[in-house]
UniProtKB/Swiss-Prot annotation:
Superkingdom of the organism of origin: Eukaryota
Name this polypeptide is given: Protein THEM6
Organism annotation: Xenopus laevis (African clawed frog)
InterPro entries in the cross-refs: HotDog_dom_sf, THEM6_lcsJ_thioesterase
Chief localisation class: secreted
Keywords: Glycoprotein, Secreted, Signal
Gene that this sequence comes from: them6
Pfam families: 4HBT_2
Family: Belongs to the THEM6 family.
Residue runs in coiled coils: none
Signal peptide: 1-27
Keyword Glycoprotein: yes
Cellular localisation: Secreted
GO cellular component, one term: extracellular region
Upper taxonomic lineage: Eukaryota, Metazoa, Chordata, Craniata, Vertebrata
Positions glycosylated per UniProt: 187
Amino acid sequence: MMLFLAIALGLIAAIFSLLDVWYFIRGALVVLKARIQPVVKDLLKEHSYSGIVLPHDLDFLFHMNNSRYLREADFARFAHFTRSGLFQAMHSLGSSMVMAGCTIRYRRSLRLWETFEIRTRLLCWDDKAFYVEQRFVALKDDFVSAVLMSRQHVIGNSPDKVVQSMCKRKVESPEYPEEVVHWIKYNDSSSQQLRAESGVSNNSKDE
């Protein structure tokens, strides 16, 4: 019995050492919670996801660690894409989505026990990807502590067809906000420079 317990504890310790177990557990719980919440039929409607800075989120300066913003943004997108039906539509079409680009700007630190909201909006899309904005808003004064822009690349289909599957009709992308236009140009310029440095042709799938 003691041997079995020791082996079990060893396996659990190994799993927690080799995998980010809490990320997968929390991600699954976020999706499950979103699935039982009311469906958000407006794809462009802003979605709010609540959070609080806990001790394990802190860096050496006792602020929320920079990497934690990206992690929390993941969970907020999971909730938004599930409640809006985006994940379900992609699954029905046999497609998937990956992060193809991300830029975050930090404006003010979030401190221990500080509560915040992540306000997620789908801004627009092109023939390959969705463009998403996420704002970290401190609830004490509604200040935007950080803002994140991401490019969610659709694999195995196109954003147009995914949206059409969700809305049961053809829907045009909203006009690109100015910051998205500049951000796309930056990404394109960076891709061209990296390809030139590595000798990769412009028709490569890797950007």
